[in-house]
Design a protein with these regions (language model features):
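Surface-exposed charge patches
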Residues: 19, 41, 71
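Non-catalytic, surface beta->alpha helical segment in thiol-disulfide oxidoreductase systems
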Residues: 55-83
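Short secondary-structure transition/capping segments
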Residues: 40-44, 64
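Local sequence-structure signature of Cys/Sec-based thiol-disulfide redox active-site neighborhoods
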Residues: 1-24
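Structural micro-motif
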Residues: 44-54
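Short alpha-helical
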Residues: 12, 37-38, 68
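Thiol-based oxidoreductase modules, predominantly thioredoxin-like and allied folds used
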Residues: 27-39, 48-50
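ATP/adenylate-binding site constellation spanning eukaryotic-like Ser/Thr protein kinases
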Residues: 8, 48, 66
Length: 86
């Protein structure tokens, strides 16, 4: 499962998200929204106004969500692209 964290500098929730992803042993890509205008527009297009925004497989969320990070680790271990069952 591919995981991308869209974040900004000096963001407490972003740092907490990185720590939780690291704790779960998940690989992820960081994108700094202050340096990538296209990424910022993409995130705004999804309806988000605050960082971090995490895209994990087919799912995405905003803010520090340890419950969804744990679900992402479980989904990754099972080889699925869905974090949340629809």
């Amino acid at each position: 499962m591919s995981i991308t964290v869209y974040s900004k500098p000096m963001c407490v929730q972003c740092d907490a998200t990185y720590r939780a992803l690291d704790k779960q042993g998940l690989d992820y890509t960081k994108v700094d929204l202050t340096e990538d205008p296209a990424a910022l527009e993409f995130i705004k297009g999804l309806g988000y106004q605050q960082a971090p925004v995490v895209i994990a497989g087919e799912d995405h969320w905003s803010g520090y969500r340890p419950d969804l990070i744990k679900a992402a680790a479980q989904a990754s271990a099972m080889g699925t692209a869905r974090v949340v069952n629809a």
